[in-house]
């Protein structure tokens, strides 16, 4: 989903280092451990980033002036090659809620460590994940397990979209809890992918 972009004038130290060329890759940004507070940092290094709206919900609450309606958008961004972000945004306009969610997803970007952790396969292709990982959100717990090439993504539609944008092609997925809650199912899958960075193996990226 494309939106018109204004000229970027970085205001954070990290943003200024990126704009000046001192930081030369998104990996350097992520490895610095510093929070990404400007989405343009991600745009600079990942111009091919895709976004997908997973859910839009109408939310109502009572205020002193009466009933107020807002929309909540849940969005993921990814380049189908090892990077994924998750975000949600709220606004009285659907389009603005989506824009806010995309911005937050970019600022929550993580690198996914891919590999072939399946004993049934053992190839050196980065088609799956290097080991079993788990992620939780609310009542939902998602377990991702490496799968051999050709199995595909054995999971529900929401989790599948997250894995696809992250660049995972084969994986077994097991989920518990209220998986019909889109936001928690998506976030639990995202959190599981974040865990791939906790362990490094010789056949992963």
From Swiss-Prot:
PROSITE patterns: RIBOSOMAL_S5, S5_DSRBD. One of its GO terms (biological process) is translation. The keyword NAD does not apply. Pfam families: Ribosomal_S5, Ribosomal_S5_C. Residues 49-112 form the S5 DRBM domain. One of its GO terms (cellular component) is small ribosomal subunit. Keywords: Ribonucleoprotein, Ribosomal protein, RNA-binding, rRNA-binding. Gene3D superfamilies: 3.30.160.20, 3.30.230.10. One of its GO terms (molecular function) is rRNA binding. Part of the 30S ribosomal subunit. Contacts protein S4. The N-terminal domain interacts with the head of the 30S subunit; the C-terminal domain interacts with the body and contacts protein S4. The interaction surface between S4 and S5 is involved in control of translational fidelity. With S4 and S12 plays an important role in translational accuracy. Belongs to the universal ribosomal protein uS5 family. This is Small ribosomal subunit protein uS5. The gene is rps5.
């Amino acid at each position: 989903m494309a939106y018109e972009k204004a000229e970027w004038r970085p205001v954070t130290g990290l943003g200024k280092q990126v704009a000046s060329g001192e930081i030369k890759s998104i990996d350097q940004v992520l490895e610095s451990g510093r929070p990404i507070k400007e989405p343009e940092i991600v745009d600079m290094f990942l111009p091919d980033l895709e976004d997908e709206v997973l859910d839009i919900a109408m939310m109502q609450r009572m205020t002193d002036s009466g009933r107020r309606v807002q929309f909540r958008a849940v969005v993921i961004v990814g380049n189908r090659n090892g990077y994924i972000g998750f975000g949600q945004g709220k606004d009285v306009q659907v389009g603005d809620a989506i824009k806010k969610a995309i911005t937050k997803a970019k600022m929550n970007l993580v690198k996914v460590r891919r590999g072939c952790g399946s004993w049934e396969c053992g190839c050196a292709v980065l088609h799956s994940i290097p080991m079993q990982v788990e992620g939780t959100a609310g009542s939902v717990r998602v377990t991702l397990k490496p799968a051999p090439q050709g199995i595909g993504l054995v999971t529900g539609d929401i989790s599948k979209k997250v894995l696809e944008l992250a660049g995972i092609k084969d994986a077994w997925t097991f989920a518990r809890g209220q998986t019909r809650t889109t936001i928690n199912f998506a976030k639990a899958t995202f959190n599981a992918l974040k865990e791939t960075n906790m362990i490094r193996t010789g056949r992963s990226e």
